[in-house]
């Protein structure tokens, strides 16, 4: 008799995705982040669901409902901080996952990569709207500043902003719709993640060498299930330590002040995971130019496969490209730091130089270096 997991319509999908899936035998811990992102999404949906049971999306009561969750709801403080810091863990895993893809040439799976870029945009949109919901000072002013950027779009800009706001400023209508979108988008993300996996399983996983691994495949279970469980345990350990020991480490103190449209905070800045893009936005003195640079800072990922000039897929055997990759990482960390600093000398010029370097590395320097490496090797 054939095993039920291979015949049952639902079980065989799970079987071919997580049990009998042929997997390269040499994939490293950098391949753990896909499963970690899945766990992060599950944590966010579950904690978010329980928060939504007690949250009210009204400007008069939103802030106090979050306070009520933290003070009066059983383990409400735990659920709230798991959700807030879970978002940070989500983005850490996302950045590492994308970085892995860039380093090892996983972007050559075009469909998988493009769905991934779409997922990144969806997660960023969800996180932005979630940050508005507690209705603190930084929530309100962050929403005002970022939505106002759309007014830079020629002709339709100001109408578009008012349409998104549902009025002439960020108000009750804005908060209500942001809550609705923040609730629905994670399910869209889950569906997109399913499509992401579907396309990945069409080709099979890449591996550190960037070479075809058809000759050396092993079943996903038990080898990689146990490896994923280790990664998940480490993720939960880090998240738990963050939540229980310093839950406000990554947050902004201004968000403990209720939103006040009459009082602007001295430094408006988004959550840490958007600071690199915010620094790029601020480094261009023109409003429309800044908005375009902001969008392109993420959208540029979609063009990476077209800029691949190397004869090798992975950077494993390309020391010059490796150096440039780590310069890119350092540059992104610099941008993240600059995004959190006030707009004054010397931060302005550092931000501008780091922004130029970011685009130059991805669009010009790395493709040319790859061509150089092709000629350095005897093919």
From Swiss-Prot:
Gene3D superfamilies: Cytochrome Bc1 Complex, Chain C. It is found in: Mitochondrion inner membrane. The chain crosses the membrane at residues 33-53, 77-98, 113-133, 178-198, 226-246, 288-308, 320-340, 347-367. GO terms for cellular component: mitochondrial inner membrane; respiratory chain complex III. GO terms for molecular function: metal ion binding; ubiquinol-cytochrome-c reductase activity. Heme b b562 binds at residues 83, 182. Belongs to the cytochrome b family. This is Cytochrome b. It comes from Cryptotis parva. The lineage of its organism: Eukaryota, Metazoa, Chordata, Craniata, Vertebrata. The gene is MT-CYB.
């Amino acid at each position: 008799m054939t095993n039920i997991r291979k015949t049952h319509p639902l079980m065989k999908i799970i079987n071919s995705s997580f049990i009998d899936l042929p997997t390269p035998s040499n994939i490293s811990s950098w391949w753990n982040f896909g499963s970690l992102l899945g766990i992060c999404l599950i944590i966010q949906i579950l904690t978010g669901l329980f928060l939504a049971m007690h949250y009210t999306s009204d400007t008069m009561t939103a802030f106090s409902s979050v306070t009520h969750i933290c003070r009066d709801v059983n383990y409400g403080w735990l659920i709230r901080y798991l959700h807030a810091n879970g978002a940070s863990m989500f983005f850490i895993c996302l950045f590492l996952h994308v970085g892995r893809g860039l380093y090892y040439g996983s972007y050559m799976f075009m469909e998988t990569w493009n769905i991934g870029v779409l997922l990144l945009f969806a997660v960023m949109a969800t996180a932005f709207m979630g940050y508005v919901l507690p209705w603190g000072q930084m929530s309100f002013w962050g929403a005002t500043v970022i939505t106002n950027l759309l007014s830079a779009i020629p002709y339709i800009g100001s109408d578009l902003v008012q349409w998104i706001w549902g009025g002439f400023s960020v108000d009750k209508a804005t908060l209500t719709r942001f809550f609705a979108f923040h609730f629905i988008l994670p399910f869209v993300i889950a569906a997109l993640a399913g499509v992401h996996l579907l396309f990945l399983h069409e080709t099979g996983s890449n591996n550190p060498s960037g070479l075809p691994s058809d000759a050396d495949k092993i079943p996903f279970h038990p080898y990689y299930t146990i490896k994923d469980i280790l990664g998940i345990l480490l993720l939960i350990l880090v998240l738990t330590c963050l939540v229980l020991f310093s839950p406000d480490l990554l947050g902004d103190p201004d968000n403990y002040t209720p939103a006040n449209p009459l009082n602007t905070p001295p430094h408006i800045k988004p959550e840490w995971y958007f600071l690199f893009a915010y620094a790029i936005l601020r480094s261009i003195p023109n409003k429309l130019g800044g908005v375009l640079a902001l969008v392109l800072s993420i959208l540029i990922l979609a063009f990476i496969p077209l800029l691949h000039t190397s004869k090798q897929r992975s950077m494993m055997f390309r020391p010059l490209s490796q150096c440039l990759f780590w310069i890119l990482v350092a540059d992104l960390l610099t941008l993240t730091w600059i995004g959190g600093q006030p707009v004054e000398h010397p931060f302005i010029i550092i931000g501008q130089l780091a922004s130029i370097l970011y685009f130059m590395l991805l669009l010009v320097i790395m493709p040319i270096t790859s061509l150089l490496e092709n000629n350095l090797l005897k093919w």
